[in-house]
Curated annotation (Swiss-Prot):
Pfam families, sorted: PRC, RimM
Name used for this protein in its record: Ribosome maturation factor RimM
One GO process term, biological-process aspect: ribosomal small subunit biogenesis
Major place of residence: cytoplasm
GO molecular function: ribosome binding
Alphabetized UniProt keyword annotations: Chaperone, Cytoplasm, Ribosome biogenesis, rRNA processing
Quaternary state and interactors: Binds ribosomal protein uS19.
Comment field on protein domains: The PRC barrel domain binds ribosomal protein uS19.
Summary of the function given for this chain in its UniProt record: An accessory protein needed during the final step in the assembly of 30S ribosomal subunit, possibly for assembly of the head region. Essential for efficient processing of 16S rRNA. May be needed both before and after RbfA during the maturation of 16S rRNA. It has affinity for free ribosomal 30S subunits but not for 70S ribosomes.
Lineage: Bacteria, Pseudomonadati, Pseudomonadota, Alphaproteobacteria, Hyphomicrobiales
UniProt family annotation: Belongs to the RimM family.
């Protein structure tokens, strides 16, 4: 199999489930049970996985893939990431202001003056809302909230996000002056 040109991470395989080759899968799709609707899934090493059965379980889905017929084969897949080609995502179903998180990666984050704050290297959800990871040349990665206050505009065609650096926590409010560290306790 050839490598995917524009891979999108769809799921990560977890532990084996039962004896018939089923695995627990963390799906990154809006509807976890729709994982098989995007066509065959691919691993980074070139293997192809076809979803035969899928059902919901606690916080994951349980999946049976073609050719994975016993627990030993299922256990060998633990930790494997599964991808599809970006072109397999259904753009026709999106509203004008909707997009896929995969489309944000690589976009440059700029403020209204055009100053760059780096490029989006990841989109994360740790439970309290989505975060964008930004990384600029020679800079440490930073996380900013993916909210309408922090991200003012998304221009997919230009490959840019317009952000409010103050709302994103990248700079202090100009009125308050330079940031001060937390006071230390006196003994």
């Amino acid at each position: 199999m050839t490598q995917l040109k524009n891979p999108v991470l769809m799921a990560t395989i977890g532990a084996a489930q039962g004896l018939r080759g089923e695995v627990r899968v963390k799906s990154f799709t809006d509807d976890p049970t729709a994982l098989g609707d995007y066509g065959n899934l691919h691993s980074e090493d070139g293997r192809v996985f076809e979803v035969l059965e899928i059902r919901e379980a606690k916080n994951v889905v349980v999946v049976r893939f073609r050719g994975v017929n016993d627990r030993t084969a299922a256990e060998a897949l633990n930790g494997l990431e599964l991808f599809i080609e970006r072109d397999n995502l259904p753009d026709d179903d999106l509203d004008e202001d909707e997009f896929f998180y995969a489309d944000l990666e690589g976009m440059e984050a700029v403020d209204r003056t055009g100053k760059s704050y780096g490029s989006v290297t990841g989109v994360f959800d740790f439970g309290a809302g989505d975060l964008l990871e930004l990384k600029g040349p020679g800079l440490r990665p930073v996380l900013i909230p993916f909210t309408e206050w922090s991200v003012l505009e998304i221009d997919l065609e230009a490959g840019k996000l317009v952000i409010d650096p103050t709302a994103a926590g990248l700079v202090d409010d100009e009125k308050s002056g330079p940031g001060k560290p937390f006071p230390t306790k006196r003994k």
